[in-house]
């Protein structure tokens, strides 16, 4: 999906809960990164957003919402560039307050496409065989395969660990 969107749109925005892998996924698809958690980069972006934008695309702008003015600068840069896949924006789904929201003048429609990212599913974690889905059960579809039941300990462990990529491979003690 990300590769297709980078070929189709000039910028993409990846949103989702903290720790679900937005930055890692973005870096996997990007060729350069600006981390706005770095105070010096953030100062540059506040001074003049164009100072952090470069031609080594796709450029990942991590935690873009820390400098809301970047949204319009990126939108304008998308208008100036003929190429697709210029920017990957990551960060919080919500700006901190109304004052910050007021700093964004344009929606980015047609230039910046939003991708929602979620924690990993039990199938992605290798804990499900994809025989039964919640949607199948909701739609009352016939279930034709038996699945080895999880014991209560395994179900509890999946709930506690969640679908966070950073938890993969941790022992029970480490993930607690």
Question: Which residues are covered by each model-predicted region?
Answer:
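Phosphate-binding site recognition
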Residues: 1-176
